[in-house]
């Protein structure tokens, strides 16, 4: 954080990485082929979402299921959370089994293009939709930030299918193209699309895309994990700097550590006592 006075002579200089000891480094997304990233970004721009099938193996899905299922307990406090929907918050404080979802290279490669450097993890939850759950109220994830539309997205979300997503078991319902809307809200005439995908697949969508959890009219649960991300100058939904111990922060990947808030948005956003927060982990 300590920069030579002569290196900062314009306001533009303040928007650069001023850290000396903890310089910004590329994310794991840099390993993804550029053509693949460009195709993903074109789909995001057109539709507001992209589906990647079979990123996780059946064994990886079963491992996640085995770890998180014992923690499933109470259902939602209101109809938005879901009266028949179980949620596990602060997953990172409990297990490392979902880390590979948070920092998957395909995800980071898109976020590197969509958001500013040192973007943050906003939430990581396991969500289990039980039989009999009704459809969730349509919403867009960055609508909780009071900045009028139309605008560029302030956030993005991934939803990972740990169980198969079907049109009947609570698959997330998207409104393609709604990320470009202005102030208007969905109407019954708008086209909606359930994200039908096999277990191990992931849908990523921008924070301005209208969507909601689908109704589960089957006799089986539908388990998913969602990781959400936001611009580095916004307040995340989950206060990870409070819920994640420094011991855990030391043990996760560099990318996850950065997304937990052990990073700086230039020039000083996120500093601790005027210094880079990574010093707390030394």
Model-derived features with residue positions:
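Aromatic-acidic/polar surface patches that form glycan- and anion
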Residues: 57, 100, 151, 195-196, ...
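A conserved hydrophobic position in a structured secondary element of the catalytic/binding core
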Residues: 93, 102-103, 175, 205, ...
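Catalytic core of non-heme Fe(II) oxygenases with the double-stranded beta-helix
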Residues: 133-197, 234-244
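Non-heme Fe(II)-dependent double-stranded beta-helix
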Residues: 2-47, 53-148
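A structural signal for short, well-ordered beta-strand segments
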Residues: 123-126, 158-160, 225-229
């Amino acid at each position: 954080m300590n920069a030579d006075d002569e290196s900062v002579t314009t306001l533009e200089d303040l928007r650069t990485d001023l850290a000396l000891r903890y310089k910004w480094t590329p994310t794991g997304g840099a390993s993804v082929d550029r053509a693949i990233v460009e195709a993903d970004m074109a789909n995001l721009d057109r539709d507001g979402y992209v589906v990647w099938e079979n990123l996780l193996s059946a064994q990886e899905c079963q491992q996640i299921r085995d770890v998180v299922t014992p923690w499933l307990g109470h259902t939602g406090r209101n109809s938005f959370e879901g009266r028949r929907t179980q949620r596990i918050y602060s997953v990172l404080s409990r297990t490392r089994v979902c880390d590979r979802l948070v920092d998957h290279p395909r995800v980071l490669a898109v976020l590197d293009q969509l958001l500013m450097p040192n973007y943050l993890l906003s939430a990581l939850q396991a969500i289990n939709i039980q039989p009999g759950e009704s459809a969730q109220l349509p919403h867009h994830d960055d609508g909780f930030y009071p900045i009028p539309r139309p605008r560029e997205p302030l956030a993005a979300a991934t939803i990972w299918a740990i169980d198969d997503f079907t049109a009947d078991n609570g698959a997330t319902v998207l409104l393609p193209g709604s990320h470009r809307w202005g102030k208007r809200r969905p109407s019954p005439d708008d086209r909606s699309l359930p994200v039908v995908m096999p277990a191990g697949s992931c849908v990523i969508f921008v924070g301005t895309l209208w969507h909601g959890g689908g109704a589960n009219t089957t006799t089986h649960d539908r388990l998913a994990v969602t990781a959400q991300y936001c611009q580095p100058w916004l307040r995340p939904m989950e206060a990870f700097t409070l819920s994640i111990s420094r011991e855990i922060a030391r043990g996760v990947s560099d990318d996850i550590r950065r997304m937990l808030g052990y990073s700086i948005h230039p020039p000083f956003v996120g500093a601790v006592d005027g210094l880079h927060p990574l010093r707390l982990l030394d």
